[in-house]
Amino acid sequence: MHYHNKDDWEEISFIGEGQYGRVIKCRKKNGFILNEQVDYVAIKIISKDKFKRNETDILEKIRLFNIPRYYSHAEDDNFIYIYMEYIEGENLANILKTKKQGRFKESRIISMIADLVETLSFLHKHHVIHRDIKTANLVLDKNKNLKLIDFGASTIQNKKQFEQYLNETTNNNNNPNNNNNNNNNNNNNNNNNNNNNNNNNNINNINNNNDLNGSGSGISTYLNEQYKQSSFAIIGTFNYMAPEVKRNYRATRKSDVWSLGCTIIEMAGGDLSQKLNGIPIIPDHLSDTLKDFLNHCLVIDPKKRSYMEELLSHKLIVHIIGPNKSKNYGVEPKFKDDDDFEEIENEKDNYLSSRFPAKFAPQYEKPKWEIEFEELEFDKDDSEGGAGNFGDVKKGLLNETEVAIKFVKKAHCEAITVCDTFYHEVLILSNLRHPNIVQFMAACIKYGEKETNHCIVSEWMSGGNLTQFLMNNHKVLENNPHLRVKLLTDIAKGILYLHKQHIIHRDLTSNNVLLDFKREILPNQLYGSNEFTAKVCDFGLSSNQSESKKLRGGSIHYMAPENLNGSPINEKSDIYSFGLLVWQMFSYAPPNTIYSPKEMASMVSDPKQNYRPQIPFNVPLKFKELITQCWDRNPLNRPKDFSIIIEKLKEIGLTYNRSSSNVSPINSPLINNNNNNYNNNHLNSLSSSLNSSPTYYAKTFGDSNSNIDVYHSADSITPIVSSPPIIKIDLTQDDWDSKLKQLDLEHENKSLISISINDNNNNNINNNNTNNNNVNDLGYC
């Protein structure tokens, strides 16, 4: 464990205090935690003799959108310091105090229930019990997102413990239940509950209004030392405690369900101290659907109480979530062996079936984007779309619109990890809208049918992926170098949008960039920037920033050194991959294809080798700087975010503009054609076809003086990135009757400049230039 150095931190404000510690808002003076720039951090300070390892274990291994992100923890001589995401917002208990009627609107309550049930269902699936669900431990951040805080009371329970608990409650409980049609049973059961409570010395002296774990800042308290570190401990807040916990039985997943019901009643303005037959009274103003949901939560007998994942399929939740609510999709946690979990290392629950148990299938409401497979038209033998890791991509029609259909191979349909990846991509795509993100249109998903085709339908991109384009059409970039800036800017804008949505792509490669062209691609043709569009695709490995800690995945040859070494993935990981894409724009081939993934991972991750592919000699200085900054070994030395990269690309684009401003008109009489038949008629005929005056602009091309680009005056010398040359004249083509020996340009300062050219025998023809300034400066990047 690291040592906490107070000198590294600036304390900003006090957040809260419990019986065993406090929470403060801090800022690290260097601004970085785990190589990630973070403005503020919430630090929970706990006395060492009261510290529970469970809390850090859970926070470290469970990463969900609705749970504050855990960074790390440290210690000094007396305390443990837990560094977590600082949430700018207020807890529900305090918000309720400001409400005139002391309650939230039902629509808002239902939305928060959906978030909370999804989060708790995921925790329970991995044997984590929160044990202190209440309004004080639910925070609305500045964007109105619900966050579940305080895992100080949480515990981890395996299956044997749960079965033992069920046996105990069966033998000791006289079958209590909350059937509203059987009030006599309820009264008898509550009498039993009261007797048990009266005999429980731990409960007798507790005031119903006091939190057993201190304040909402979340430092756990234990009533009896013998229960410490055990799910048998009576921990939590009394008014929210399940009846079995009050009777000193262990807390289980069902206990969280009861606490959830109590929390909802408080959200709705109810009084938890008012009970009927031991059950909090449900406010009359709630809808029948919400009341029915509460009746599934507030059941005295835990065996008859619903599980959290069963609540996911209640019509109240299905109506809100559907299958396209993505933000709580979590990372499979792997706990240490000493946690003594059975089968947890191999547990790969099917995410689709866990969200929608079969017995609730009739309540499923199909989202707008889900289609029937029969609605798609495509040729099964068509291979135009290509193939991927998990299936083929085919060109097809949906409602007479050209689309790309991404299939999951039937052989993969039963593989749970593939199903999760496929479904996860649908969840992400269905919520994204940006001109540089491939537009999701529909999906075909069938639950529990192995033979069903699973597919994602998106817009058809006519240009294929960037890998294919660079390998087969790199001459287009050589003749239209401004397109490099355009395509890279498109990619950067797409990734910047993802990062603003708190999504990290994690697999940014040339295969996952698709292109669209407005006209046919020909090697020697000249194109405008607006004729090319690049869009980012393939989000199967993408993750929420709060979920991405210690996630690994992606294409090895594009992965950053820190990720290969197991460090957290963040925005800087995508920036590293982008650096390799910039490099690829000049090398035209994927990086490091001569090495195996294993060799590549070793060479890149090793600080001594620190391998990167060699930058081609033809890469201009500004691009070299961008490449080396993006793939720097130290993430802190990379650009802060993609907005910085976009600005750098914009600056490179402006150099084209500045170069163009030095280009001079070529008037036909100034072209000396002493020994050939190529004359002004060629330029004049071009001008006539364009319905413009015969005035042109010249620009040298690359490092070669044998070619010259001619611009029509209609372009008005606007930036090259938006207005490319109309025609390029190659002075060495054999179809010319003879060679131009000299080309005079009228420069801005009215001096004449002559440019050396080569004849077909590569003999240099001396020039008579009197002023060669700016000629080489006009070269493209």
From Swiss-Prot:
Annotated GO CC locations: asexual spore wall; cytoplasm
Additional remark text: 'Zaphod' is a fictional ex-president of the galaxy with 2 heads.
Reactions that this protein is recorded to catalyse: L-seryl-[protein] + ATP = O-phospho-L-seryl-[protein] + ADP + H(+); L-threonyl-[protein] + ATP = O-phospho-L-threonyl-[protein] + ADP + H(+); L-tyrosyl-[protein] + ATP = O-phospho-L-tyrosyl-[protein] + ADP + H(+)
Annotated positions binding ATP: 15-23, 44, 385-393, 406
CDD domains in alphabetical order: STKc_MAP3K-like (cd13999)
Protein function: Positive regulator of gsk3/gskA activity required for cell pattern formation and a downstream effector of carC. The kinases, gsk3/gskA, zakA and zak2, form part of a signaling pathway that responds to extracellular cyclic AMP. The pathway has a role in transcriptional regulation; required to direct prespore/spore fates during development. ZakA negatively regulates prestalk differentiation by regulating expression of ecmB.
Gene3D superfamilies: Phosphorylase Kinase, domain 1, Transferase(Phosphotransferase) domain 1
Residue span, Protein kinase domain: 9-317, 379-654
Low complexity: compositionally biased ranges: 171-209
GO terms, biological process: adenylate cyclase-activating G protein-coupled cAMP receptor signaling pathway; cAMP-mediated signaling; cell fate specification; positive regulation of kinase activity; regulation of aggregation involved in sorocarp development; regulation of cell fate specification; regulation of positive chemotaxis to cAMP; signal transduction
SMART domains, per the entry: S_TKc
Protein name as annotated: Dual specificity protein kinase zakA
Gene Ontology MF term list: ATP binding; cAMP-dependent protein kinase activity; protein kinase activity; protein serine kinase activity; protein serine/threonine/tyrosine kinase activity; protein tyrosine kinase activity
Stretches for region Disordered: 168-209
Family, similarity comment: In the N-terminal section; belongs to the protein kinase superfamily. Ser/Thr protein kinase family. In the C-terminal section; belongs to the protein kinase superfamily. TKL Tyr protein kinase family.
Enzyme Commission code(s) on record: 2.7.12.1
PROSITE patterns cross-referenced by the UniProt entry: PROTEIN_KINASE_ATP, PROTEIN_KINASE_DOM, PROTEIN_KINASE_ST, PROTEIN_KINASE_TYR
Residues annotated as the enzyme's active site: D132, D507
